[in-house]
Amino acid sequence: MADNILLAKRFGCAVCPLKQVKNEHPNMQPTGTDTPVLYFLGEAPGLDEDKYNKQFRGQAGQRLRADLYTFIQPDDADKYIRWNNIVRCRPHDGKANRTPTSIEIECCKQSVYNDIEKTKPLVVVGFGGVPLKAITEGINIGIWVNRFIPVKFGEHKCWYYSCYHPSFLIRQGNSYTTEYDRYFKICLKNVFDFVTKNYEEPAIIEDGHTDNISILYTFDDVIKALDSLKSEELVAFDLETDSLRPFEGGKILTIALSTYDRTYAFPIYNYWKDEDFKKIKDKLYELFLSGGGFIAHNLKFELEWLYDMFDLRLLMEGKWHDTMVQAYLIDERTTKVKAKADGMFKLNILTYLNFGFKLKELSNINIKNITSSRIADILLYNGMDAKYTYLLFKKQNKRLDKSLKICYNNLIETTITLTKAQSKGIIIDLDCVDKYIEKYTAELQDLSEKIHNLDEVKKFEDMTKKVFNPLSPEHIVYVFEKVLNIPPKVLTKKKNYSTNDFVLGEFAKDGYKIAEYITAYRKTNKLKSTYLDNVKELANNGVLKPVYNLLYTQTGRLSSGKDSNA
């Protein structure tokens, strides 16, 4: 596959599989203006486009044009917009359209890039995941819809703006149509507002990523650098650690501090003489309490390590900032849980969104096993993290209006409080835990005996040659449907026999003891497995240290989660 991709990049149309596919208008050329403000980029021509030799003429194209014409007159559209597809021949299987392959995309996209460079639009508006993947090399469309990404085609810098493909809206059917329709129109409005009211030149940092990063290996250099930062109004900092949390032997490997124009990175763990390390710690402590503001990306993570290294005073008296909190507030999506899961608020993605490069691609280290990397590589990566955290803070801070800054300050205070709560932990009465484990274990054994003494369960085991599992929906369905011959009361979304708690409750009302016992077994097992079984393992020396989350909860309320290092 890799060799085929290289051939496709080099020879283009000459080696494209679509050359062998019969089409009425192969190699369809762009239409619209030669001096576009907007460059509309689709996936590939469909049946109607191939027939009429013009982009966006099928059902999806008509849908797009209908919404588009609420913002611009039909006669004016081609004066400001250029229309093209990332693949210029219709991909199909002889009957229906299909998604173009990666080889077909590689064969065609350079000619599209050349056209964008030549016509110099302000914004390339991409519809669907295919053009997005081609231009950004694999980013998921779900997190990039309604996002402006700074990109470069040859020597031309512009923005890439991602929209859902109109055919996606058509496929959703009635259940989603209203919401997706609304959002699609919002996206189109946003791109028109951007070019007519709010346009700014794309900022792409192409080189110099490691400029002004000083790697410090001597005691005198570290002390001098720390002293020089005391007068700074703002300093970004970043820690590289060997684990997620500072418990059970976790270590800070390196630290970096940056004002963007100068960045210092130096080792922490297992490098200095004891007396020198104590002096470095004292200088760091003085610096963090010197009166300036200190910026982190994911402040709660960094503060938990600093609390472990220093004390509570540092948390409570330091002046802290968080670029992740900024990004969270700037992001207008209501479902931010999904955005976090997709990595939308990671520094690597935010540098791409704001500065046009992916930070991880500049590093030689293995993030998942950082201790396997050379210390020099870790320090350089650490320095870049701090450097671009500083720059990101400056840029995002301009986007926080007065009301968002109030929210921001409140979230910073909450972050400090949650860090304190996490670090101090919750004292657990382990003797009490043991008593409850013993109690629920006995209850489960009693219920299990009652269940396995039922005639229908014995018949199940005779028929299937399996031991009945009261937590298995498959086993429960078999007993009700094939042993007891009871029709379903409720079907699941997939039209299967439901055995949820409501259904079992109804069966229990009908006098079926198996339903009553299984319901009780489920409840008791959940109490034991969820709240007791892992407590002794997680409660180090009788203290449980949960992870508290505030930014990315579904309901907006505080949630918590366990951590393998807790």
Language-model regions, residue ranges each:
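Alpha-helix capping/helix-boundary segments
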Residues: V130-L132, F301, H475
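A short acidic-Thr-Gly-centered motif at the start of a beta-strand
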Residues: M28-T33, F153-G154, Y217-E233, K283-F288
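Nucleic-acid-processing active sites and adjacent nucleic-acid-binding tracks
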Residues: Y260-F294
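Acidic beta-strand-to-loop metal/phosphate-binding motif
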Residues: L122-G128, A236, G292-L299
